[in-house]
Every structure is written in C-alpha cells, then in structure tokens.
C-alpha cells in the first residue's frame, strides 16, 4: 500500500496549492524523481531560459524545496545532487556544471522565501544547502530585525558604514 501511494504521489507537489507527500516512502520517491529530472536535463544542457521552461524544471525545484521544508527533512542538497550526478555511469559530466544547478536551486529558494515574506537580504545573510536550517535562521533574523534592538543594531551598523565611507 505504501508503494502504491508513493507512486500516486511521486509528482506532488504539482503547484503551490498542491499538498506535499508526507509518508516517508512517498517523500523519498518524490524527491528522487525530481532530483533525477533536474540532474538529467541539466546534464544534457536543457535549462530553463527566460520564460521558457518546457520540462517544468522550475516547478520540480520548487517541489523539492517544499518537500524538504514542509516535511522538515534535514539534507544537504549539494551532497544529494552530487551523488545523483555520480550515478549516471555514461553521463557526459563536462556538460553538467553542478554549480549551475545549485545556483538554479538557490534562485528558486529566494523566490520561495519571497513568497513567504522573507526578505532577500535576510536569505542572503545566511547560506546553507540545508534549507530547513536556512529558513529557520532567516525567520529568526527577520523577526529580530523588526524589534527595537534589531532596529538599533541596523542603525549603528549604518552609521559605522557611513563613517568608514566618509574617510
């Protein structure tokens, strides 16, 4: 029954309003399927460009981000992607720039964070391929910035920066 449910859920989430799978088998299959699609298409240099995304790679990457965050899965995405690349035995690795794929994910994460009302600057202040850890820290930092102490810290930093630029 778990395998049948996982097969039914493997393409979820299909969009921002679709539910993420929550059973371990379903999550594993959905993550594996999406990572394989991204690595495979980036491996043959089929990347989204501008408004063109015929293979729904943006949706797949946002699906991975949502699966990881909404199910509190603590994984290092860069390790998972590098492992996936290594499983392609006859794969022309020269065509696949892993950094391009990781940057693609980073940009998708910034869009996800923006949709969750997390400032771009806050996301940029902390870097981690563990998205759960990253968003937890970003939320904490964003909450702090809006307190009186946070505003005072930013004002002091701005003053110090202006003094240094003036000299």
Language-model regions: role of each:
Residues 1-167:
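Amphipathic alpha-helical "coupling" segments that flank catalytic cores
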């Amino acid at each position: 029954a778990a395998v049948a449910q996982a097969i039914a859920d493997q393409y979820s989430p299909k969009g921002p309003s679709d539910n993420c799978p929550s059973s371990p088998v379903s999550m594993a299959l959905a993550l594996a399927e999406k990572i394989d699609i991204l690595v495979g298409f980036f491996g043959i240099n089929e990347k989204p460009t501008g408004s063109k995304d015929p293979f729904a790679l943006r949706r797949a990457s946002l699906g991975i981000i949502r699966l990881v965050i909404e199910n509190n899965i603590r994984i290092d995405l860069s390790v998972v992607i590098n492992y996936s690349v290594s499983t392609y035995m006859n794969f022309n690795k020269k065509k696949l720039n892993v950094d391009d794929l990781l940057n693609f994910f980073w940009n998708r994460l910034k869009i996800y964070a923006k949709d969750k009302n997390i400032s771009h600057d806050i996301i940029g202040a902390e870097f981690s391929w563990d998205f759960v850890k990253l968003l937890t820290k970003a939320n904490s930092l964003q909450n702090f910035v809006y307190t009186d102490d946070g505003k005072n810290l930013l004002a002091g930093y701005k003053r110090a920066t202006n003094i240094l630029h003036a000299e």
